[in-house]
């Protein structure tokens, strides 16, 4: 490819709407252009990266026995209603009607449609196990699309579905995909960590996310690296090793104290002279069927994912000021569990074990002191519903947990019979008994992986692509394209590289060398070969490594071998 022919419109200024580095650089380097909020056109450079990621994914899926197919983007509402997810999925599901007023959805995932396919085609244990996958556009109507390709409304994803006879078979398929994902992201040149996670709207039991570690990541990962321990979890899933026990402190009589204008934990602590750990925070939530009061210690935060799972609800949201007032009789900041009626109380173990705690009094400008769970109010459910923090003990080995930011690029799920039972996908076993097919699903965000690679591999000058997914491996730059000797040598280098299977761009533009160098750094070619007067005279090419800025001089007769060796290290 010649740079004069390459459609790669670069920008010198950072677009105002681009918040994160990957979004800025993908726009500036001419990889993508915005079509609408969360919707992008992928230009030729981006497509080369995407195709390389897809090829790595295909090779690893095929290695495990996966078979590629392609399912429709437009899915009939009936199968979503049959699975129970039509109403559960919420506003993120793109819904549409055809001219006959029939309901459809744009697929955010394909569990329903793949299960219906298998329901109609698989009937015997002899047809299992089965691994089917696709690479397909997905659609989610994000409330606030942001961060470019990180959180868009249209994106490219690989989703594989496993179908097994039993849980034992599912475990085998799950580990196959765990290993395959590890190889995919290793081959993409990414620094990542598999972490325990919550299954969310997909459902099922065990699940792992694959997180690319980057400061710009939206997710928080808690991990342990002590004593050879490899525990890691999304903060939404991170567990605690033990439950708090009550202290031997003697219970004192409950009493009310005026706390004018003290709504926050910090204000109450300062006014009453108590530490935050002596306060029980009461937060009011609404679900689709009831009102909940979530209790955590004053120095803790509610983990809404854990609370949702503990409650058994489908949806959960923090109650507004009007709801809090109608339920408690007080403004936000003064809610408490004592005397609370018509509300299910779910308490974290620390809050349940509190002695002589401070709570809201369900009366404005008033708090209660010496409140004791069990004596002064009844807890309906004790469950781990709080956020775990860095420094707290690892649930496996007890060492202090550390914190990192991550970008989720893949997730694997054990679905069990969640969809097969709902949609009637069954098979006959060796004894002729009908059994539900046991399923797993496994997703990789292709376009998100491209963005995550940039978040992890960039500097102030531009992108630093890992060689395995770079749009081109090498850019060849003649310093003066009007110099016949330099241009002829650049053409020779360019032709020899392609003949050796090395993807190269010849920058044949009449721009100044400095402009070409800046564009090369911005786009992120792993290697830059410069052809100047000295190169022509000495038959020696200058090769600059984008990753570390090192420059080496290579004789022309060693060109292909040296370039191949250098790319292997990148």
From Swiss-Prot:
EC class (word): ligase
Localization, UniProt: Cytoplasm
Keywords: Aminoacyl-tRNA synthetase, ATP-binding, Cytoplasm, Ligase, Nucleotide-binding, Protein biosynthesis
Catalytic activity: tRNA(Pro) + L-proline + ATP = L-prolyl-tRNA(Pro) + AMP + diphosphate
GO molecular function annotations of the record: aminoacyl-tRNA deacylase activity; ATP binding; catalytic activity, acting on a protein; proline-tRNA ligase activity; transferase activity
SUPFAM superfamilies referenced in this protein's UniProt entry, alphabetically: Class II aaRS ABD-related (SSF52954), Class II aaRS and biotin synthetases (SSF55681), YbaK/ProRS associated domain (SSF55826)
Keyword Cell wall biogenesis/degradation: no
Gene3D superfamilies registered for this protein in UniProt: Anticodon-binding domain, Bira Bifunctional Protein, Domain 2, YbaK/aminoacyl-tRNA synthetase-associated domain
One Pfam family in the UniProt entry: tRNA_edit
Endpoints of the signal sequence: none
Main location, first listed in the record: cytoplasm
One GO CC term on file: cytosol
EC numbers, comma separated: 6.1.1.15
Subunit and interaction comment: Homodimer.
Domain notes: Consists of three domains: the N-terminal catalytic domain, the editing domain and the C-terminal anticodon-binding domain.
PANTHER family registered for this protein in UniProt: MITOCHONDRIAL RIBOSOME PROTEIN L39/PROLYL-TRNA LIGASE FAMILY MEMBER (PTHR42753), PROLINE--TRNA LIGASE (PTHR42753:SF2)
Function: Catalyzes the attachment of proline to tRNA(Pro) in a two-step reaction: proline is first activated by ATP to form Pro-AMP and then transferred to the acceptor end of tRNA(Pro). As ProRS can inadvertently accommodate and process non-cognate amino acids such as alanine and cysteine, to avoid such errors it has two additional distinct editing activities against alanine. One activity is designated as 'pretransfer' editing and involves the tRNA(Pro)-independent hydrolysis of activated Ala-AMP.
HAMAP family registered for this protein in UniProt: Pro_tRNA_synth_type1
Record protein name field: Proline--tRNA ligase
Species assigned in the record: Pelotomaculum thermopropionicum (strain DSM 13744 / JCM 10971 / SI)
């Amino acid at each position: 490819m010649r740079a004069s022919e390459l459609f790669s419109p670069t920008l010198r200024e950072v677009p105002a709407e681009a918040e994160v580095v990957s979004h800025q650089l993908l726009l500036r380097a001419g990889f993508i252009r915005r079509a609408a909020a969360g919707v992008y056109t992928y230009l030729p450079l981006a497509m080369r990266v995407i195709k390389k990621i897809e090829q790595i994914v295909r090779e690893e899926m095929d290695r495990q026995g996966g078979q590629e197919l392609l399912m429709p983007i437009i899915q009939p509402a009936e199968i979503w209603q049959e699975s129970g997810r039509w109403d559960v999925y919420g506003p993120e599901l793109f819904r549409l009607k055809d001219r006959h007023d029939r309901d459809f959805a744009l697929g955010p995932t394909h569990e329903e449609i793949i299960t219906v396919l298998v329901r109609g085609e698989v009937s015997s244990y002899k047809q299992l196990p089965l691994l089917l996958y696709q690479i397909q556009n997905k659609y989610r109507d994000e409330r606030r699309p942001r961060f470019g390709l990180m959180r868009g409304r249209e994106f490219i994803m690989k989703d594989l579905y496993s179908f097994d006879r039993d849980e034992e078979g599912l475990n085998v398929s799950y580990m196959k995909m765990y290993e395959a994902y590890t190889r995919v992201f290793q081959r993409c040149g990414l620094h990542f960590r598999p972490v325990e996670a919550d299954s969310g709207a997909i459902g099922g039991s065990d699940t792992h996310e694959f997180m690319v570690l980057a400061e710009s990541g939206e997710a928080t990962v808690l991990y342990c690296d002590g004593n050879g321990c490899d525990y890691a979890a999304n903060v939404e899933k991170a567990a605690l090793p033990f439950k708090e026990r009550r202290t031997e402190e003697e219970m004192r009589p409950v009493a009310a104290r005026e706390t004018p204008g003290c709504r926050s934990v910090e204000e109450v602590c300062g006014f009453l002279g108590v530490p935050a750990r002596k306060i029980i925070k009461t937060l009011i939530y609404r679900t689709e069927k009831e009102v909940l009061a979530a209790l955590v210690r004053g120095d803790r935060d509610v983990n809404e994912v854990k609370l949702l799972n503990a409650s058994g609800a489908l949806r959960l949201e923090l109650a507004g000021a009007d709801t809090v007032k109608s339920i408690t009789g007080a403004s936000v900041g003064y809610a408490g569990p004592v005397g609370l009626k018509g509300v299910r109380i779910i308490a974290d173990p620390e809050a349940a074990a509190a002695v002589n705690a401070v709570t809201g009094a369900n009366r404005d400008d008033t708090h209660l002191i010496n409140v004791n769970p069990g004596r002064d109010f009844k807890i309906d459910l004790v469950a781990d519903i709080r956020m775990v923090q860095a420094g707290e003990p690892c649930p496996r080995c007890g060492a202090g947990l550390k914190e990192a930011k991550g970008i989720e690029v893949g997730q694997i799920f054990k679905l069990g019979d969640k969809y097969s039972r709902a949609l009637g996908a069954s098979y006959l076993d060796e004894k002729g008994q009908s059994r539900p097919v046991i399923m797993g699903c496994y997703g990789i965000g292709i376009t998100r992986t491209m963005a995550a690679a940039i978040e992890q591999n960039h500097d102030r000058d531009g992108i630093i692509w890992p060689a395995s997914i770079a749009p081109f491996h090498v850019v060849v730059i003649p310093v003066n394209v009007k110099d016949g000797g330099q241009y002829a040598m650049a053409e020779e280098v360019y032709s020899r590289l392609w003949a050796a299977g090395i993807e190269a761009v010849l920058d044949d533009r009449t721009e100044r060398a400095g402009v070409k160098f800046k564009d090369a750094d911005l786009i992120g070619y792993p290697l830059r070969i410069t052809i100047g007067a000295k190169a022509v005279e000495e038959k020696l090419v200058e090769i600059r490594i984008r990753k570390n800025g090192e420059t080496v001089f290579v004789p022309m007769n060693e060109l292909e071998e040296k370039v191949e060796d250098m790319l292997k290290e990148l």
